[in-house]
């Protein structure tokens, strides 16, 4: 799903690898993290072998977290304009509404589209996370 979001938004990067693991979440972040540190050591081995910088999935969460690593911010109502004033997700709220990968949920809940905010793709909007990702992709690729 992450790579498809990059294609949909003309980002020009591709995530190189993913793995699945047989794990049932406990409902507690602290418990899950402790289990990863003691009983799921294969996660750490794979992370080091393949120089992974992030681990997550579900409802575009992995792409969302990668976006933060690349300096993309959540939504334009976030008062921070650093490092990119244009680098926010987008949320459209009339009627049922929708939101891009980085945007918070709508007031009345709305679907998250597998798109990065990009005024040149599907919706004529101002925020432009696609440009943030393009600007930072070489730095991220060279991370590990």
Curated annotation (Swiss-Prot):
Cofactor binding, per record: Binds 1 zinc ion per subunit.
Gene Ontology process terms (BP): proteolysis
Keyword Phosphoprotein: no
GO molecular function annotations of the record: metal ion binding; metallopeptidase activity
UniProt-listed PROSITE patterns: ZINC_PROTEASE
Reaction catalysed by this enzyme: Cleavage of Xaa-|-Asp, Xaa-|-Glu and Xaa-|-cysteic acid bonds
Protein name as catalogued: Peptidyl-Asp metalloendopeptidase
Record: active site: 65
Known role: Metalloprotease, specifically cleaves on the N-terminal side of aspartyl, glutamyl and cysteic acid residues.
Cofactor: Zn(2+)
Top class in the EC scheme: hydrolase
Enzyme Commission identifier(s): 3.4.24.33
Family that this chain belongs to: Belongs to the peptidase M72 family.
Disulfide bonds: none
Keywords assigned by UniProt, alphabetized: Hydrolase, Metal-binding, Metalloprotease, Protease, Zinc
Binding site for Zn(2+): 64, 68
């Amino acid at each position: 799903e992450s790579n498809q979001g990059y294609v949909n938004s003309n980002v020009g990067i591709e995530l190189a690898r993913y793995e699945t693991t047989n794990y049932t979440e406990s409902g507690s972040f602290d418990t899950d993290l402790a289990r990863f540190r003691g009983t799921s050591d294969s996660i750490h081995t794979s992370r080091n072998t393949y120089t992974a910088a992030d681990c997550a999935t579900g409802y575009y969460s992995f792409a969302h977290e990668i976006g933060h690593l690349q300096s993309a911010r959540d939504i334009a109502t976030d008062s921070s304009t650093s490092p990119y004033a244009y680098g926010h997700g987008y949320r459209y709220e009339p009627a049922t509404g929708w939101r891009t990968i980085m945007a918070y949920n709508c007031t009345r809940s709305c679907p998250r589209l597998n798109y990065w905010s990009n005024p040149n793709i599907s919706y004529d909007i101002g925020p432009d996370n696609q440009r943030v990702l393009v600007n930072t992709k070489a730095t991220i690729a060279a991370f590990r």
